[in-house]
């Protein structure tokens, strides 16, 4: 009501996309049997997979959805979730009083913090330009490639074997 009274829209901009098509680019039709209903997606995969599909789609074009696309997003979701669970586990006993100064950190921790900084700059730029799919891809690539496949693999032994008060473990 306040927006009606002020005679201004309750938003700054509107983002639209093309039609939603099947994964082969065909119009969905009950007679073709290629309809993917949001209710079915929610039942089988959950709301988070549907959200990832939306944000990962190129809204400049028609959106495609189907079994293979949803399976891929479910796999990405699982990988992102596992990465975040690993981070939460590694940080569960973190005490801010034991923070290590950046200059005292091992090189690999400085590298990963730089990657986080670069990622945050990209996310801000992509957000300002409504490049939502690029945000998703950058975050996924960072979590999957830089963290899970590289950094975590190197630092597992440090987390499990180094003494709790060592600089290496506290830097992780």
Model-identified regions with their sequence ranges:
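Long, charged, mostly alpha-helical binding arms that flank functional sites
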Residues: 7-172
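Short, small-residue-biased leader/transition segments that mark boundaries at the very start
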Residues: 1-5
């Amino acid at each position: 009501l306040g927006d009606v009274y002020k005679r201004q829209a309750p938003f700054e901009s509107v983002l639209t996309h093309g039609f939603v098509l099947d994964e082969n680019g065909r119009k969905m039709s009950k007679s073709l049997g290629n309809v993917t209903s949001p209710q079915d997606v929610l039942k089988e995969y959950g709301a988070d997979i549907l959200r990832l599909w939306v944000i990962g789609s190129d809204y400049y074009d028609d959106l495609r959805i189907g079994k293979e696309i949803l399976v891929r997003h479910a796999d990405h979701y699982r990988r992102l979730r596992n990465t975040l669970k690993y981070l939460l586990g590694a940080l569960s006993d973190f005490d801010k009083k034991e923070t290590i100064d950046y200059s005292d950190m091992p090189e690999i921790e400085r590298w990963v913090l730089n990657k986080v900084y670069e990622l945050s700059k990209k996310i801000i730029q992509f957000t300002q330009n409504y490049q939502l799919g690029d945000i998703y891809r950058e975050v996924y690539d960072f979590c999957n490639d830089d963290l899970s496949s590289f950094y975590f693999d190197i630092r597992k032994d440090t987390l499990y074997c180094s003494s709790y008060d060592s600089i290496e473990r506290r830097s992780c």
